[in-house]
Amino acid sequence: RWSSPGYADLMVGTSADVAFADAWLKGVRHFDVRAFYQSALKDATVVSPLAGTGRKGLQRSIFNGYTDTAVDEGLSWSMDGYINDFAIGNLAAALAAAPAADDPYAAHYADDAAYFHQRALGYVNLFDPAVGFFVGRDAKGNWREDAKHFDPLRWGGDYTETNAWNMAFHAPQDGAGLAALYGGRAGLAAKLDAFFATPGAFHVGSYGEPIHEMLEARDVRMGQYGHSNQPSHHIIYMYDVAGQPWKTQDKVRDVLSRLYIGSEIGQGYPGDEDNGEMSAWYLFSAAGFYPLRMGTPAYVIGAPYFPHMDIALDNGRHIVIDAPAVSDTNRYVQGLRVNGQPWNKLTLPHALLAQGATLEFLMGPTPSRWASDEAALPPSLTPHGRPQPLRDPGAATSSTPTIAGLTALFDNDSASEAVLPATSTTIAWHYAAPRRVALLTLTSAARAAAPSGWQLQASVDGHHWRTLDTRQQQRFAWPRQTRAFAVPAPGEYAHYRLHFDAAPDASPRALAEIELLGPTP
């Protein structure tokens, strides 16, 4: 969770997940990716018995789609979780595309990829359109505060070492989907403009007194932008997503020119140098590109800081960045050539840079329309429209034979569970209108073994049934683990049933939760 070293109950997110997934997807092969994947899977799907490991609030957040307000700073836990889920999904997709013959988990990567990619869209669950910000919700879905009492300048509460303004852009994995929440790319740009224009005042909120991050953010003098701490570091580059890259270029130059020079107002290193991120931000930004969408083998383009920069790679090759006219005045990119060829996109593939490359920037004193059309922008999970994570809307359920405490399987909380008979057992769902089920999830119980074989069936009329998916010899590696199973050919049905095979050892089995996930109408 946090490089302390060792386990420590600090900060939010299990960001080793995105860090190692990103490394693998960029070609780093000096670690055991299978062991890492299982570690990331455990972070994302297993309720940890230890406070210093795993993700907080997971017993409900997996099913609600967000970490609720019963968890301190649950919104920040949620938002970092979506970024990590995105990276896990991308790694799973890569491993599914090229499975190793001796990998015992090979058959499951594709299911995981589908599951984690849709989980990465869960940020939409915390966006309150009444206030235009991400806001915490309780387990029942109620907002922490209504529009009358909401204060985007207040630190803490839902937000770790920051406020609602600095969490307003915390979905780099799905920039176009985020933009849709603000009315489109122009709306995202307007929200960013307001962010940088809002005076750098702060309200201490749940912290009770100023903490150093508040004071450092104020001293940045770029509105609410707090370059002093990690939650803000990607925000400038979100102008690329909004289709206004000249504003990224302008503000990157401002940060590099003012916030790293020292002496004037005590800035120098402008804040927390946690695990080297402040230096890394400088080096990437000075080179003219930045890893905005961690967990993908690509970078977004900003603007170079130096007339000439040469990065020597371990393979003996070089990334050469030339911008002979660049200056505080000539801060805007007018054009770019990569290895001598015109480049009109805002992304650079990692593989291209890793083999050595020459980037030639043409700079000028005024903004240009270079790489600002739709086709030039960074990709997103949701290319168009509002994000639509899969949901389980609930339905009338029954079981044969009768399962005592059946409702525990549908209460969005893995702390409760139900015991299934050792004999074959069927659970049925009856919806008021036909719906499509794309994923089945099962969550193992705390102690008893989970079922190992089942068939998911569906019916239009409740009488004629079609088998959608069959699984055999399934295993849950950990207690209270949520596993996802993709439906190969989903259709529109009003009736579903899950038929569990009899236990091979004739002993009862147990589950903590079942979900039938599909798109919402």
Task: Enumerate the predicted regions with their spans.
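Aromatic/His-enriched, Gly/Pro-containing loop or helix-boundary segments
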Residues: 2-14
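Active-site core of glycosidic bond-cleaving carbohydrate-active enzymes
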Residues: 13, 17, 27-320, 324-325, ...
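Hydrophobic, well-ordered secondary-structure elements that form the walls
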Residues: 175, 235, 283, 336, ...
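Short coil-to-beta strand junction motifs in C2/discoidin
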Residues: 304-306, 328-333, 447-455
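Short strand-turn-strand beta-turns centered on an Asx-Gly dipeptide
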Residues: 314, 338-341, 461
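C-terminal beta-strand-rich structural cap/linker in extracellular carbohydrate-active enzymes
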Residues: 350-383
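Predominantly extracellular/luminal regions of secreted and cell-surface proteins
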Residues: 386-412
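Aromatic, loop-rich ligand-recognition surfaces of beta-strand-rich domains
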Residues: 404, 408-472, 479-521
